[in-house]
Each structure stands twice: as C-alpha cells, then as structure tokens.
From Swiss-Prot:
Name listed for the protein in its UniProt record: Helicase swr1
Biased composition (Acidic residues): 499-514, 572-616, 656-678, 705-718
Catalytic activity, as annotated: ATP + H2O = ADP + phosphate + H(+)
Enzyme class, UniProt record, top EC level: hydrolase
Source species of the chain: Aspergillus fumigatus (strain ATCC MYA-4609 / CBS 101355 / FGSC A1100 / Af293)
Length: 1695
C-alpha cells in the first residue's frame, strides 16, 4: 500500500485503471438504458461514500471543478456542503497570488507550494488513489457487466456533452439526436429540490464528449470526483420513480435570462474609502522633488552616510564592466542611423520573376483542374443520357413535372397578386368617385343654403319679409325636422320623385286640381303671401305642371302650420319638384347660377341619400353652433338686452316666433329654428314689426280675394313671367293693384325673346328688379303713395350719381331699404355706403351670424365698426364688454376714432409694460369701468390667460389677415375666446391662396362639440378640393384661359361667400374719390450690381443650394439677390481703399547696422575731448539767448542748495576708515561709508555742472540784436527802382494781377484743395515708412533751420493723405445703384410738380441708405419703422400731413402699412416688391383713402432681368386670384337689388382690370404674337415645365372624360366584361357577354355572343372573393403624424 492506495499501484496505473472503469461504467449505462438515455442525467441517484449512501442531486453548474473534494469520512449525514463551492471551513488560504494577480481559492486551484501542511490535505495522486480504492473496495464494478453504472455525468460547468465514451461496440454509441436532446434538457434541469446546490452538481459531473478526448485527458485530474458508484437496485428504483420525466421534458424549455444590477456595497467606515493617490505617476513624484535633498540643506550623519553609499555605488557602476559603464549602458550607444535603401539587384529581379512564374503556374493548375472537373461532369452526363434506366427516366420526368408545378404555382400567385392589386385599384377608384359625389352633394347643399340666405336678405332690402319664401325653400331642401311618421318623411323629401312614386298607399286629393281650384281651396290660409303666389306664378311649365308648382308652395305653407302644432291641412302629394325653382338662373356664367349643382336627373338618381344628408347639419355657412338653434338657447342673451323684438303675428297663431322665424320640431321633439332662418341676414331692427305689418297689408289684397277671374289667373300661371324686361315707364307696382295689372306688366317682357323665357328666374326676382328700376332708377323719381307705404325715396345706391353731391345727412328714420337707424350716440355723418354697411352688420348680429367686413382700405371700416357698437348700445342696450384687437401701430388711432365718433363709450387702451398692464387690470371686472378694450395681437398672446376669463360680447379683429394661418398661435389663441359675436375687418380677405380665406371663415365658424364642425368650411380638404381647379388655372395660365367648368366653380364659390362677406371698392362707392394710377418702373442694374449679381449666381454653392430644394436655403439665396437689386452695399459694403503698408522700407533695413558702424567709428567719450563751449570759453556761442533769460536762469540756479548738501555729506563721511572684514558689523560699516563717498562725489559733480550751465551769459543777447536790426525787405512804397533790377522785372513784381497769376506752392495747394479732395482717389499699391529719415541724414538735419523742419503749412499733406487712404465718395451711394439713380430723377420731378411721396421698403438697412441718399440731396424727410414707438407714430403722421415742406416719408412696409393715414402724400413709391401683393396694397391705401383730394400715382421699382421680375409675375398671379375670387364676386349691398335679365342669362361684360393690364404689359398675353415663346423668355424653366405638364394633364383629363361618355373596348381582348357582376353569394363562373346597350337608335343587328376573356373572369372572381375584405385607403400624405408626447421614443429601424 503506497500513498494510501488500495493495491499499491503507481500514479500511472491508477490513472489507467480509472479510465478503464469509467469507460466500462459508461458502456453499462448505455446498454442498460437505451430508451431513456437522454433523461438519465436528470435522474437523481444515490452514491455511497465510505459505505454510506448519499443522494446525488444535480444542481446548477459550477464555474470550476474543485481539485480536492470534501472529506466526508467524518460526516454521517448527506447534508450538502455550504457554501455552494466550498465548505464553510476552508483549508488553506482564501486567496493567493499567481503571476502577479490576486486569485480566489474558491474557484481556482491552490498550488501545492501554497497549501499549508495538514492531515486533511490530499494531493492529486492521493485523490485518484482514493477513487480507485473506493471503486475496488466496494467490489461492485465489473468491466464486462452491462449493469454496472458510473457516476451521473454532466459536462464541464454543468453543460452536458454530445455523447458517451465508446469501447468499439455499436450498441454503446449514443444517437446524435439523443445527445442533442440531452444537452437541451441539461441546460434547464427539471424539478429541483431545495437542497440542490452547485457543489453536488460539480461533484457528480463527468465529461462524456468523445470528440475531445485529448482535452479530457488533460483535464482528467480536475474532472474525476471521489463519488463512488451506485447500487443497481437503488439505481433502478430511482429510474422507475422518474421514468416519465424525460417525456415531460422532451420539448425544449425556454432559457430564462435575468439581468440584475451589480449590487453596490455602501461604505460602513471611513477607512473603507480608498484615499486618493498623492501622485498619479512616477514622473510626477520625480518632478515634485519630494525626498530630494536640497543643496543648502544640512544632513544628519545617518542621511549623509546613506547618500555617500549611494554615490559610491554609482561610481562603482561607472567603472569598466559596471552597469553604468559605456560598454554596458545603453545611454552610451550611438543613435541608430537610417540605412540607405538597398539597390534593386539581379537577385531581386530573379526573385520577382520566380514569384510571377509561380503565380502563372498556379493559375494554369487551377485552369486545368476546372477543365478536368467540367470534362468529368460532361462525361457523366453523356453516360447517363446513353444508358438511362427506366427508373432514371421516371425520376427525371417527375423532377421536370415538379419544377413545372412550382413555376406554375409562382406564376399563379403572381397573377392573383396582380389581380388583387387591380381589384383594389378599381375599388379605390369607385371609392374616390363616391367621395367626389358626396363632396358635390355637400357643395350643392352649401350653395342652396347660401342662395336662400341671399334671397331672404334681398327680399328684406326690397321691403318684403321673405319668410315664407325661405320656409318653402328650406322645406324643399331638407324637409321637416319633426318627422313623427314615415309618411311625413316622404312628404319632406322634395328633391326626389322615386320615394313619391313608390308610395302608392297614399291618395293625393289635390293632384287633379288646377291652380285656380287650389287657390280657392287654400285662399283662407292665414300665412298666404305674395311671395308664395309669385313662386307659383314663376314656375316653369316645361318642367312641371302648374298645379304641381302651386301645390309645392302650398305644401311649404302646410309644413309651417304643421310645425306650429295647428290643424294640418290635407296632405298633398308633390310630383316632380323643380330643383331650380329658387335659383336666379340656370346659366353657368351668372353669379347665381347652378345653385343646385346638378339637374333633375341627378337629383332623382340620388334618391333618399340627399334627404338624409340634408338633415345632417344646418348647412354650410351656419356660423354658430347647434346650441343656438334651439329656441330656448336663442333667448339666452335676454338678460344682456339682446332679445329680439317681437313681431306682430297675423291673426294670432301664425306659427312664427319673436324673430319672425318659423319653428319646427325635430326628431327628438325639441323646437328649433329652421336652418335657413337661422343663418338669414334679415336685420330685425326696431322697425321690424312695422315693416312686417306693412308687408302683410300689401299681401292681403291679393291673397284674400278668391273671387278673381280664373282666366286671368290662368294667364298669370301660363305666362312665363321670369323673362319679363323691366318696365321703361316710371309707373310703380302698387300693392292694391289687381292681378291683371301684374300680368300686363309682365307681358311687356315678351320682346326679350324666347330664349329669355326658357332661361328664367322666379317671378319674385323680376318684380323686385322692376320695383328697383321704377323706384330707384336714374331719374331717382319717388313713387306715389300706396295704401300701406309712404312715398318712397331712392333706395338703390346706384342713384348716387353726381360725385360732387353732399353725403346724406343723418336722420333718426332710416333710408329706404335700410332697417337700421343711425344711433344717436354717433357723432358725425355716415356716408350712404357706410350706412348700408351698418345695416348689414346689424342684420348679421340679429341673426347670430359672424361676418367679414372686407371693404377696400380707406372706406371707413373703423367708423362702421364703431357705429355697430353704438347701435348695440342704443337699440339692444348692450354696452359691452367688447374686445378690439388691432396691430400695435394703430392702437392710438383706434382710441382717437372712438373718442371722435362715439365719445359716450369708455375706452381702455391695453398696452404698455407688464407693470402698466397689471395696473390697468385692477378693477376691470366691473362692467361700468369701461366698455371697449383695445389691445394688440402681441399682447393678446402674452396675456391670453387673463383675457380668456372675460366673456366678451363682440370681438373685432382689425387687419384680420394676421390670423390667415390657422396653424399660427394667434389664430389658435383667439379661437378659444368666449364671445357672443365676431367681426373681421380686412381689406385683403384673400392674399395668397384659398386656405387663408378658409382660415378666416372657420375662425368665424368654430366647429361643433363633436369636433366635426359645420358642414363645408370645417373641412379644409373638401373646401380645397372643391375650388382647387380654378386656382390652379388662374395661377398657371391666367384668367383669360378659364374654361366653362372653372367659371362655374368660381360662380359657386361666389354664391357660397356672398352672404358673409361685404366688399365695396372705392371706385364704386366713392364717386368723388380721386383716381389711382399704377406705374411699373424698370431700373437697369449698375455695373457693380451686375458684377455682384452674376458673380453670386455663378457660384457653385449657389447652384447647389438652388438645386437642393431646401426651402430655407433657397429663400436665403433669393434674399441675397434682392439685396443686390436694392443696393450693393446691403450685399457687400464698399471698402475703404488703402495702400499696402510695409513695416520696414528697404532703406531702413540697414538702420541698425548703420547705427552700429557710426557708433563704433564716430564715438567719442565726452571726457576725453575738451569742450570749450561747456567751459564758457566761446562767448559768441551764447548769443541765441537774451540777457533777461540769462539773469532769470542765474536767479533760479541751485548752486546754493547743492553746496549745503555737499557740506553735510562731507561731515557725515569718515574719510579715514579702511575696510575691516573681521566681523559682520565692521563690514557693514565699511560698505555704508563707501556709499556716502559715492553720494559725495555725485553732489560735487552736480555742483560743478550747475555752476557751468547757469554761468553762461551772452555778450549782446538776442534782445539787443533785434533792437538794433533793420528789415531790409520793408521799403517805402514810393521807393524808386533799384539800380541792379531791370524795369520789366521791377514792374512785374509791383503788379497785383501778375502776382495773383503766379502763386506760391502754399497758395497753389490751397487753391487746388477742392480738386485734390474730389479727384485724389488712386492710392499707390504700396507705401513704406522711414523714407524721409533715410533721405535726411542726422548730419544734414542739423543744418536745417527749425522753421524749415516744422513748416506752418504743408501744401502736400492733403494730397498725401488722399493718396494713402481713399474713402468712398458719397456720390457713389447713388451711382452704385440703378434704383437710386431712377429715384433721384423721380424725386426731382415730384418736387418740381408740388407732389409729396411715400417710399416703402421691406429692409430696415435700406431705410438707412435712403436716409443717406436724402441727406446728400438735401431733401426733408421723416422715417417710420418697427422701432418707432407707438406714441411717436401718430405724431409723425400728423407732422407729415400738416407740413408741406417735408417731401418724403420713408417707411417700412411691415410696420408703416397698417392703419396709418398719410393723405398728405399723393405718390407712393415701392422701392422693392413684397412677396405678398396684399401688403403692397395696404401700403398704397395709406394715401389713397377718404380725405385724399389729388390723384394718386403708384410707382413700383423693378430691376430688370433679375429675380424681381419673377416676383412681380407671381404678385400679378396672386392679384388675379384675388380679382377672380373676391373682386368679381360683387359682395356688395348693390348686388341685392342690381340683378337684371342679362345677368341671369349669363351676358357678362368682358372688362379687364388693372392687374390683368399690368400682366399683359409685363409678360404679354398668351394669345398675342409670340405666344408661348414670350412666356418662355419671361418665366423660369421650372415654371414652363410645370405649365406644360399641367396642360398635358388637363388634355388627358378631357380625353378620359370623353372616353367615359363613349363606347370603349379594351384593345387586344376578345370582349368587354359584364357591367354587372355576379349576384351576391354566388361564385362567378364563365359567362357569355354581349355588346353593351347604348342609348341611341335601336338597330336590328344580329350579334353572336362571344366568350369573355380569362382575365375578366379572374378579375370578377377576385372581386367576388374580396367583397368581404375592407378597403385599405391610401395614407394621407398631407397629414403629419404628431410627435407630441413621443419625443422620448426613438424610431426603430426596420430589419
């Protein structure tokens, strides 16, 4: 027994026996459990150590295997060791150092030399011998026994390997799948007991990977444990108990990964904190000097001894052979030198050639191998083709069929995908068509609503109520809201005949009655009116019968009575309603055309859909929420004094509310106002009851006389009264006249022709127009009195003829056609059109409608607004609070206007600093403190939280184009204010596009509570889609090329906007307004401008920027170009010209050498040479001083004080003392005595110099010499000619004229000073300093007199300065810019003609240049820009208007174009053009407004052949859009009474406005000579391409439309698919198709049926298959996803 082993074997034999036992045990395990081999590793087994059985439970894998297992001989219980990797009692150190690194002994093997001597320690050999002893001692392991088992095995670190060790038998090999499954199971062990630990897993694991035998043999010492084998009975018992475990764990268990943060151990003691290093590196320690001994320090004996030893060691090391010797130390080695490059020798050539040859051989070998491989393949293929077996042929056929089947499947899949895409495209096209139809229906409803509102307002202006008319039209459109049965719903559907014809159960008693019988039947109805009769009379006989038209009107009356809860009339079945009954015309070119949008066929095709849609909302332009439509909510302002005036009802229960509006019951039973009445424009003023009673009196003679002759009434019905021309005579239409007179009047219109009769409007329009012509014609003749009216006055503003007439005087009674009197609070006189504007605004307020007052600037929108607020205070007793938001520049202007026109209002101007505004807000909740608050847009944004707390009654926004962008903060903030009514004031409602107009309209019409908003304007997409086509055509091709469809769309837009926009022009309402002339002045670029412009455009960076498409970069480039056009100094400042200054000239480079030479050669010590002058031995050298000066110098001499100091110093000095250095004290005294001697010598020297310097005295002195000197130049005047001078010379010297002609240098320099200043501009290329000093040497300088060295006047100084530095000439400011040159000429002409001008520009720096320009020319001017304070603006405007000496007022177009009255000027000059032409229009209206007495001329400066030409073109396009949409819409009060037959039938006067004329002058007309070539020259290439593409798209669209109306066959196909698909629920099959039926002449042609195409069948099948799938709509690219709240999320990339 050796080393404790059982058999005394060596270590080598022990290892061999251990391997054999291990292999045998593995074979046994493989044989014994082949079906469950994969699960056996998971089965807990028992092991016996020293005869004691223990449970071996697999646990989590350990990091490293222990080298020495625990000693379990003393432990009798199977308790696992703790902690997991080691026992609690650790044998040996817990850590050790290995290779300089600290390692833990828990996971690393402790080296033998570090392990302490102990009885428990076991070496590796002892460990292996212990294992062998246990194995052999138990006697249960037999190599040949198949039942022998080894220890349970697991891979290293708990991972099982892929197989077992084999002994050559095939039965012992574990299948690969089983091993893989064993690996998967081992990673996630199943049910673990709480006692399982990592130590058990490591103790019972062994390697079993056959592929890594070498690695396993190397790790065998650490992998083999001391666990003995298990008994067979106990093993199979355990296996039986866990048999089903492998089945449960057959599938892979997901691996869980839990990430936890590394725990942070807190500091429990101050010593735990590691102190920072004092030095970060050895170099820092060396540099710090710590530990170094200073040179002057005193060392202790011990330190001195240590230092001596170190030095001795260093000396020894420097000896030969030492470490620091030159032979050993590397410091003495010479620096390595770079070796020269070796020459390319023959050997290098040989090697390179050999390598190249090797490369060629390799390529050849590869080529040969590839060729051989291909040849072998070819041979194999040929052999297979020659000798094919039947099974090979069958296999090839099967393979070919399989490939074809796969390809066919792919082709079918691709075909079905294409079919699916085509079906989706067809479905999407159908969806788009349906959406277009829905949009068109919404547009038709909007037009119908606007038409009804317009007609009602028109009737009100003409003196009629119009309530019945509006009720009838409303009933026609949307039916009755209160539908209690299906029959009533069918009755209310006025636009479809399908529902009427399908309802066969109801019997219409009135269907067979004539018009006369119906009148007799319904003659006693209380609400019969003249309007109803006129509508029945004006019915079109070609479309429907007379009885039907009359019954239609009576049905409306019945609906009104039904809605009031009265006894309903007998229900009338209506047949074929004319949708154009209430329209003014069917022509496409009139303003009231095509109100219904489609014809009767379209209305019939819509069916009940239009009825359903008409009940959805109140209409397009209802500018208030649905809350206001409830009757109870309509009176919610009663407490504010805003309750409508009651109207006297006719015969008691007339079914009208207080406002004269009909009441209907909706589906819920609530009473609401009718939709059309809700948005009506009828002004219910104080005289409303009187007017209605008068209208009732007028109606009664006609409606209450059933005894009229039937023939006359039939004649009225049969005669088409709509085309009757206005009567030429002045005979008025009396309300009491019989019906025959009406027929006689209408018969006079038969001369207009049959075409007028066919295209007519209702009779009410003709009668109204006739009354207008009779009452307010050119003669302005008043009509005679009638039964119910007083003698009328001219009620049309067209009667205002003479421009020199005085404006109408205010009166308490309103003018004819006006229901609103001028409030007595208003001071001053309203003009007639302003009174009409007040009436229009009052009508909007009475009907709870918001509007836009868009009068041209200068017509008094401010006065009309003030009059409206005064009207509310007088008539409705509503004093406020009102909010007026204006630009900052006109706050004080509004305050002055309020105090001037309505001093009864209390005004608060809300502006100033934060503290001032806080003071103004104190006590402002009291309504009596102020009535109107005037503030600016900026302050509204700043103090929005405070302003939102108030409930404002009326909110007025001046210059409302500030909220044209609905995305801006201003728009969104003001939209949330709580107001009763809103009014927008703007002179430019349309500036750039229709979206801005939509923003204004939506601001007046906020959306409902559900978020959908009122139909129409609340949907920007629909609004833009409706009117997109005319906008594109106008901007791209001009207004002259609009087609008929575009004109119809524009007319529809006018119809929608007309009730809500009031727009009057100065030329229409102000006849005395002076004319306005616009001029475009083209200015050439100067040479400098052209150089800068072309240079900037030719830059590569500019071209890249313009081609990049970046909006901001392009705008920046355009702004730079505009700066060049305005003035080159804005782009690049003209530099001050200076010469290149050399620091040192060539002559002065040798100054230092010259000084050195002179000093060495000419230097003389002053004491080596006798100076007689210093010794006063040269008496005549002192004659330059006077005797008095010499006496003063002697008197001030310091000889006496110096002598006293010398005596004192002499006494203090010890002249006998010698130097004694024995002691410190004696040394210091000797040094001090030497210093005294030096001071004594210095005093003596000063005393000597003082005596010599002040002892100089002159012999005569300058005073005596000057006294005795006589001036030889001053001779007497009468002196004779000198004998030495000739007579001619003497006479020339005496002549003053000749003396003036011959000037000296100084005089000539002074005379030429102006020329030098103006023309000395060429500076030398370079200048150098020191030339004068080099030219005048010091020796020569001493011979120059003082007078010559310092002359009093230098004649060349000015020329020298001008030629050394040249400032730019002031005149270059003008000559560098072509615009300023043209402006100079224009200002001189204006000043000569007595005109005054306003100059507008966008750039503030340009204002600075204009100031310099005006100062140069001496023009008086004023300036106003954004930095001007609010208080100063009004002062400046008043000063300019009152002082005629001021020629020019220069302003910024952004700040000086808002609300400023500058009528003192009659000329407007736009120095540069604005991107937005509306801004220029506002600027020019600063002087062209009320109060201007002279014609206004407007000049626009445009630099030719530059970007400004394109800006002008774009501005003209925007002006044309404004002209077409706004100006031609005739949104005036005249339009209510100005309609005639010519307007109705579409005869428009083709007149060009000023914008079109300017466009023709600049770009010519498209129809002129040159055509497209002229456009190509004027426009950019991008614009030309865009126009051509748009033209192609239009042509293609026309072709498509034409193709839709014709028969189309798909080329290349046999037939056309069926129009109707298969029935729902049926699978489409192969069907025969015939020629489609076409509406035309039926011809008997025999057509044989032809089979359809397979593609058509596929499309039908796919469409049937996809019928239940939802349609995927394309994403809306215009909508941007909001990132609000998602800023923290990062977008993930798609992989």
């Amino acid at each position: 027994m050796q080393d404790g082993s059982l058999n005394g074997l060596s270590h080598h034999n022990d290892e061999r026996v251990n391997h054999e036992n291990e292999d045998k045990s593995l074979n046994t395990s493989a044989l014994g459990d082949s079906p469950d081999s994969a699960n056996r590793e998971l089965i807990p087994s028992e092991s016996k150590e020293n005869g004691v059985p223990t449970d071996s439970i697999e646990g989590p894998p350990s990091k490293r295997r222990k080298l020495a297992g625990p000693d379990n001989s003393r432990r009798s219980t199977p308790r696992p060791p703790s902690p997991p990797w080691k026992k609690a009692g650790v044998d040996g150190p817990t850590s050790f150092l290995q290779d300089g690194k600290r390692r833990s002994s828990r996971v690393n093997a402790i080296p033998l030399e570090l392990q302490p001597p102990s009885d428990k320690r076991k070496t590796r050999a002892a460990q292996r011998s212990t294992v062998n002893k246990n194995l052999s001692g138990n006697g249960k392991v037999v190599a040949s026994s198949p039942l022998s088992m080894s220890v349970s095995q697991s891979g290293i670190n708990g991972k099982h390997t892929g197989g077992n060790l084999t002994t050559g038998s095939p039965r012992t090999a574990t299948p690969r799948g089983a091993s893989a499954r064993r690996r998967r199971i081992s990673r996630s062990p199943p049910r673990q007991t709480p006692s399982r630990t990592r130590s058990q897993s490591s103790a019972t694991s062994a390697p079993n990977d056959p592929t890594s035998h070498n690695a396993r043999s190397k790790r065998s010492h650490s992998n083999v444990t001391s666990t003995p084998t298990i008994g067979i009975d106990e093993l199979w018992n355990d296996i039986g108990g866990e048999t089903d475990l492998g089945d449960e764990q057959g599938q892979r268990v997901p691996r869980l990964r839990i990430k936890v943060k590394k725990p942070v151990i807190g500091f429990q003691h101050p010593s735990h904190v590691i102190p920072p290093r004092k030095y970060n590196s050895f170099r820092e320690w060396l540099e710090s000097g710590e530990g170094r001994i200073e040179d002057g320090a005193v060392l202790t004996p011990e330190a001195a001894l240590v230092e001596a030893r170190k030095r001795c060691r260093v000396l020894e090391a420097t000896e030969p052979g030492g470490l620091l010797s030159p032979e050993v130390c590397s410091a003495y080695l010479p620096e390595q030198q770079e070796e020269p490059p070796q020459q390319y020798s023959h050997q290098d050539h040989l090697v390179a050639h050999a390598l190249y040859f090797k490369k060629l051989l390799d390529q050849e070998h590869r080529r040969h191998r590839n060729t051989a491989r291909l040849l072998a393949q070819w041979c194999a293929d040929a052999w297979r083709k020659r000798n094919k077996r039947p099974e090979d042929i069958l296999r090839e056929q099967q393979e070919e069929v399989r490939v074809k089947r796969k390809q066919l499947a792919r082709d079918l899949q691709k075909m079905f995908d294409l079919a699916r895409a085509e079906v989706d495209r067809m479905r999407l096209a159908r969806w788009e068509e349906e959406r277009k139809v829905e949009d068109q229906r919404a547009l038709d409803r909007a037009i119908k609503q606007s038409t009804m509102l317009f007609e009602k307002r028109r009737l009100e202006i003409l003196g009629e109520t119009g309530s019945d008319f509006l009720d009838s039209t409303d009933a026609e459109e949307s039916g009755t809201d209160a539908t209690t049965s299906d029959a009533e719903e069918d009755e209310s559907n006025m636009s479809s005949t399908d529902s009427e014809t399908e309802d066969e159960d109801e019997v219409d008693d009135d269907e067979g009655l004539t018009a006369e019988e119906l009148r007799q039947k319904y003659a006693d109805l209380p609400q019969s009116s003249l309007v109803s009769d006129r509508e029945s009379v004006a019915s079109d006989t070609s479309e429907s019968s007379d009885g039907t038209r009359t019954s239609h009107i009576l049905q409306n009356i019945e609906d009104i009575n039904d809605s009031q809860g009265e006894t309903p009339l007998e229900q009338i079945e209506l047949d074929e309603v004319d949708p154009m009954l209430l329209d003014d015309s069917e022509d496409e070119s009139t303003d009231m055309d095509d109100d219904m949008g489609d014809s009767d066929e379209d209305g019939d095709a819509d069916g009940t859909d239009s009825d359903d849609e008409s009940d959805d909302g109140p209409g397009l332009l209802g500018f208030f929420s649905s809350k206001d439509r409830v009757l109870n909510d309509a009176h919610r302002f009663d407490d504010e004094g805003d309750d409508p005036l009651a109207v006297s009802n006719h015969e008691g229960g007339s079914g009208f509310d207080d406002d004269g509006q009909s009441v209907s019951v909706d589906e819920d039973g609530d009473e609401e106002l009718e939709d059309a009445d809700e948005v009506s424009l009828v002004p219910n003023g104080p005289s409303n009851s009187v007017s209605i009673s008068q209208s009732t009196a007028e109606v009664s003679p006609v409606t209450e006389t059933p005894d009229e002759e039937p023939d006359e009434q039939a004649e009225v019905v049969d005669t088409d009264m709509a085309a009757a021309a206005p009567s030429e005579g002045p005979a008025p239409l009396e309300a009491s006249a019989p019906l025959e007179d009406l027929v006689a009047i209408d018969k006079r219109g038969d001369a207009m022709g049959e075409c007028h009769r066919q295209q007519c409007s209702p009779l009410v329009n003709n009668l109204d127009e006739q009354e207008l012509r009779q009452n307010g014609g050119a003669s302005s003749e008043a009509s005679p009195g009638t039964l119910a009216t007083k003698p009328s006055e001219p009620e049309s503003i067209s009667s205002f003829e003479a421009p020199g007439e005085k404006p109408p005087q205010p009166s308490e009674s309103p003018a004819p056609g006006l229901k609103t009197p001028i409030p007595h609070l208003l001071r001053g006189t309203l003009r007639e059109y302003q009174h009409y504007g007040l009436d229009w605004l009052a009508g909007l307020y009475n009907n709870h409608i918001n509007g836009i007052l868009a009068d041209e600037m200068g017509l008094g929108k401010t006065i009309q607004t003030i009059a409206l607020l005064a009207h509310l205070a007088v008539e409705h007793e509503v004093w406020g609070p009102h909010l007026v938001v204006v630009p900052t520049s006109v706050i004080l202007n509004w305050e002055m206007e309020f105090k001037k026109w309505c001093p009864g209002f209390k005004i608060m101007t809300y502006y100033g600093s934060i503290e001032e505004r806080r003071q103004k807000r104190k006590g402002w909740t009291d309504d009596t403190s102020w009535n109107v608050l005037i503030t600016s847009y900026q302050l509204v944004l700043q103090d929005q939280q405070v302003l939102k707390r108030r409930n404002w009654h009326y909110m007025v926004l001046d210059e409302a184009h500030n909220i044209k962008n609905f995305r801006s903060q201003k728009w969104q903030t003001l939209l949330t204010f709580r107001t009763r009514a809103r009014l927008l004031l703007t002179g430019t409602p349309l500036q750039n596009n229709l979206t801005e107009l939509w923003s204004l309209l939506f601001f007046l019409m906020p959306s409902d509570g559900d978020g959908t908003g009122i139909e129409g304007f609340a949907d920007l997409r629909n609004f833009s889609e409706w009117f997109r086509r005319p906008v594109e055509q106008i901007l791209e091709h001009g207004r002259e090329t609009m087609d008929d469809e575009t004109k119809r769309v524009v007319t529809k837009l006018h119809t929608i906007l007309r009730p809500y926009i009031l727009r009057r022009l100065k030329a229409d309402v102000e006849k005395q307004m002076p004319a306005k002339y616009e001029h475009v002045v083209y200015c050439r670029l100067s040479k400098r401008q052209r150089f800068l412009y072309d240079g900037f455009m030719s830059m590569a960076q500019t071209k890249e920027t313009l081609a990049s498409g970046n909006y901001l970069s392009i705008i920046n480039c355009l702004m730079q170009l505009r700066k060049v056009c305005n003035h080159p100094d804005l782009f690049e400042t003209r530099q001050i010209s200076t010469s290149f200054v050399m620091h040192h000239s060539v002559a002065t480079e040798y100054a230092s050498k010259e000084q050195l030479v002179r000093r060495r050669l000419l230097y003389e010590h002053p004491l080596t040479k006798l100076d007689l002058d210093f010794l006063n031995l040269v008496p005549i050298s002192r004659e330059d001083i006077s005797r008095r000066l010499a006496d003063d110098s002697t008197r001030l001499m310091a000889y006496g004080p110096f002598n006293i100091l010398r005596e004192r110093q002499y006494k203090r000095t010890n002249w006998q003392m010698m130097f004694d250095g024995s002691t410190v004290q004696s040394t210091l005294e000797a040094l001090e005595n030497d210093a005294r001697k030096r001071r004594m010598a210095e005093l003596e020297r000063c005393l000597y110099f003082e005596s010599k310097r002040h002892g100089r005295r002159p012999v005569y002195g300058t005073s005596l010499v000057e006294f005795l000197t006589a001036d030889s130049k001053q001779k007497p005047t009468l002196g004779g000619r000198p004998q030495t001078q000739s007579l001619a010379e003497w006479l020339s010297n005496r002549s003053s004229i000749l003396a003036s002609m011959i000037l000296s240098i100084e005089e000539r320099s002074q005379a030429m000073d102006g020329y030098v200043r103006r023309f000395a501009c060429v500076t030398p290329a370079a200048v150098a300093s020191g030339i004068t000093e080099a030219a005048l040497t010091p020796i020569e300088t001493r011979y120059l007199t003082e007078k010559e060295r310092f002359p009093p006047y230098d004649p060349f100084h000015e020329a020298q300065m001008r030629l050394s530095i040249a400032f730019p000439d002031k005149r270059l400011l003008q000559y560098d810019c072509g615009k300023l040159q043209r402006l100079d000429k224009l200002l001189r002409d204006l000043k000569a003609g007595g005109h005054r001008a306003l100059i507008f520009t966008q750039m503030t720096k340009m204002l600075d240049i204009l100031e310099q320009f005006l100062n140069i020319h001496g023009h008086r001017y004023l300036r106003l820009d954004g930095t001007t304070k609010v208080e100063q603006r009004q002062i400046l405007t008043d000063r300019f208007n009152n002082d005629d000496r001021i020629l020019v007022f220069i302003l910024s177009s952004r700040s000086g174009g808002l609300g400023i009255n500058l009528t003192g000027a009659d000329t407007v000059i736009f120095y540069d053009l604005d991107w937005n032409p509306a801004m220029d229009k506002q600027c020019q209206d600063r002087c062209h407004r009320i109060g201007q007495t002279r014609d206004v001329h407007i000049y626009r400066f445009v630099s030719e052949h530059t970007i400004e030409s394109n800006i002008l073109r774009k501005a003209n396009q925007k002006r044309m859009l404004d002209d077409v949409v706004i100006q031609e819409g005739e949104f005036t009060t005249d339009y209510f009474t100005k309609l005639d037959v010519r307007d109705m039938i579409g005869e428009e006067a083709e007149a060009q406005d000023e914008a079109s004329a300017a466009m023709d002058r600049v770009l010519s007309s498209r129809v002129a000579t040159g055509g497209s070539r002229v456009f190509e020259q004027a426009e950019d290439k991008e614009d030309i391409d865009a126009a051509k593409n748009a033209q192609k798209e239009m042509e293609q669209a026309d072709n498509d439309d034409f193709g839709d109306r014709s028969i189309s066959h798909t080329p290349g196909q046999v037939g056309t698919p069926l129009a109707t698909g298969p029935q729902e629920g049926e699978t489409p099959g192969a069907q025969l198709i015939t020629t489609p039926q076409i509406h035309g002449v039926d011809e008997t042609v025999d057509v044989e049926p032809q089979p359809g195409h397979i593609d058509d069948y596929l499309l039908r099948f796919m469409e049937w298959n996809m019928k239940d799938e939802p349609l995927v709509l394309p994403p809306d690219k215009t909508k941007k996803k909001s990132k609000k709240g998602k800023e923290h999320r990062l977008s993930k990339r798609r992989r």
